[in-house]
Structure formats: C-alpha cells, structure tokens
C-alpha cells in the first residue's frame, strides 16, 4: 500500500500530482476544463466498473478494488474500501474497511464501522456472517458468525469482555450451560 502513489483522478484520467499544474494549463490552452474529482491511491469503482444487480447511491463511497455481490445496496453514507466487500445481497449504511468480507442478508447499520486490515485488524481478515445486524453507530474488530446482532452504539473488539446470556437472559458459558453470574464473562476474539 505505501508504494502506491496518490494520483489526481480527473475527467482526463489519472494524473501524477507533480504533472497536475502542467496538465491543467495545457487543458485550459486547449479550451477545456480539467476537473479533479479526488486525490487518492484508488479511483471510484463506478468510474471503471458497475457490478451487476447492485445499487450504489453515492459513487464516491465505493473504491475500485471493492467486490459487491449481486443484490447489495450501498446507501449514501455507506462506504466500502478496496479489498473488501459483500458476498450477496447486503445493506451497507456504515463503513466496511479494507480486508473485510460481509456475507449475504447482513445489514451494516448507519454509522456502523467494521475495523479492517488497515485500521487495526492487522492481517486478520474480518468476516461478518449471514443475516447479521450491526446497529446504528456500532462497530466490530472481530469476526462474527451467522445471525449475530451488535446493539446500536456498541463497539466489540478483540479482548473486550463480553457477558454471555441465553434467550431467557440467564448467564451462560461458551457451551451454553447456565452458570452463576460472573462466570459468563469471556474475552471477544
């Protein structure tokens, strides 16, 4: 990643930053305008490829190198980085960082964040299983299996202490056996 250059992504294609002023003047002399959409290592996905069967409400929110499975919706505040994406129909209203895989029928709620390989996840690929819900403004730094819900505003990261309970709100251990309160606390991993 550090070896990639930041480029000016323009209506005339990518331009090295050191050449930008020259190209701007040349374009002006030709009677045209040079429009710079952004300066970054990656362009927007939709400027080069639009995956079949997806909805991307704001093209600037999905970088080239992201993978979107058919049926995925990325809302205006949603964001998907390069080397990240969705396997099938998913709703993305939050941030999906580099190196993250989100499975089908999962909703990344508004303002939710999934920590990736560039934001503290290191080389661990974080995956979110099928039919999961990350509530508004929640976040994770660990992988989740199928059917998980992270409450709005809650951030779960590796090493965070988590209390386990069953459907009756009784304290349980990792095997699901009812235990005394306090014996149901584990570290997320």
PLM regions and their residue ranges:
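Short, surface-exposed, charge-dense and proline/glycine-enriched linear segments
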Residues: 21-32, 99, 105, 117-122, ...
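Short, positively charged
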Residues: 45-54, 123-125
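A structural motif detector for beta-strand N-caps
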Residues: 54, 60-62, 66-68, 72-74, ...
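Terminal amphipathic alpha-helical/low-complexity segments used for targeting or macromolecular assembly
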Residues: 1-47, 185-189
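C-terminal segments of enzyme domains that contribute to small-molecule binding surfaces
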Residues: 121-125, 130-133, 158-189
């Amino acid at each position: 990643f550090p070896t990639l250059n930041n480029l000016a992504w323009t209506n005339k294609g990518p331009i090295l930053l050191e050449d930008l002023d020259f190209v701007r003047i040349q374009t002006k002399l030709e009677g045209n305008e040079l429009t710079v959409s952004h300066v970054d290592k990656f362009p927007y996905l939709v400027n080069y490829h639009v995956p079949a069967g997806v909805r991307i409400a704001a093209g600037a929110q999905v970088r080239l190198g992201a993978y979107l499975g058919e049926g995925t919706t990325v809302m205006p505040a949603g964001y998907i980085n390069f080397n990240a994406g969705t396997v099938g129909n998913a709703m993305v209203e939050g941030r999906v960082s580099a190196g993250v895989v989100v499975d089908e029928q999962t909703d990344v709620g508004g303002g939710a964040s999934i920590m990736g390989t560039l934001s503290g996840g290191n080389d661990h690929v974080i995956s979110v299983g099928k039919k999961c819900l990350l509530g508004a403004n929640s976040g994770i730094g660990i992988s989740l299996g199928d059917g998980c819900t992270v409450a709005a505003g809650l951030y779960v990261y590796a090493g965070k202490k988590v209390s386990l309970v069953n459907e009756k709100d009784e304290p349980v251990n990792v095997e699901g056996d009812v235990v005394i309160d306090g014996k149901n606390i584990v570290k997320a991993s």
